Amino acid sequence: MSLMNLPEESRPREKLLALGPKSLTDAELLAIFLRTGTQGMNAIELADKLLKEFGSLRKLLSSDENEFCSHKGLGTAKFAQLQAVVEMTERYLFEKIEKEDALTSPEHTKRYLTRMLRDRHREAFYVLFLDNQHRVLKGEILFEGTIDVAAVYPREVVKRSIDYNAAAIILAHNHPSGVAEPSQADRRITKRISDAVELVDIRVLDHFVIGDGEIVSFAERGWI
């Protein structure tokens, strides 16, 4: 059945405008993005099918171009649209932490770092560079590695911190395994980076480890 043949209150776009986006299911939100279905399937039915094939909305959003376009009803144009939506989301979250003290708004910082790192298939090491009032100057992935390790060089963290005239930094990296518990190697590299940046009067304020649905803070553990 075409969406136009559904009662108005059941059409995703009309429902969103009347009740707000939180009232919609994942399939209804995706249907608005898709706009049209395929032969024999309306946009909601196609969205529901795609969510089952990918396993979740998050997996669909984090899929690469080859995986995304291998599904019927999706193509490069839709992939480009999706990447634009994802990038706008990341920029929106960055703007929120950029305008605030990263320590007095830890939930915004955690949300941003989770969005940036959680769904990466390889380990990535991210640094937030802060000024002397702990406002964000820049955020950057400095190192990327394999599925379970990224080589991290303290001297490069020092160099980039000086480049951005940072007074403090927040470290973060993901565990593609999904388990956020820091390893002994994580603790050692944090200590090495802390020691290195302290030589140029820069402080490490925290190190977040991002897992699947969990985030561990070194500062909250008393390790920094």
From Swiss-Prot:
Xref: InterPro entries: MPN, RadC_JAB, RuvA_2-like, UPF0758, UPF0758_CS, UPF0758_N
BP GO terms, sorted: proteolysis
GO molecular function ontology, one term from the record: metal ion binding
Protein keywords: Hydrolase, Metal-binding, Metalloprotease, Protease, Zinc
UniProt-annotated binding residues for Zn(2+): 173, 175, 186
Protease listed as a keyword: yes
Domain MPN residue range list: 102-224
Any Pfam family matching the protein: RadC
Motif extent (JAMM motif): 173-186
NCBIfam families xref list: PRK00024.1, radc
Family membership: Belongs to the UPF0758 family.
PANTHER family registered for this protein in UniProt: DNA REPAIR PROTEIN RADC (PTHR30471), UPF0758 PROTEIN YEES-RELATED (PTHR30471:SF3)
Protein name stated in the entry: UPF0758 protein VF_0126
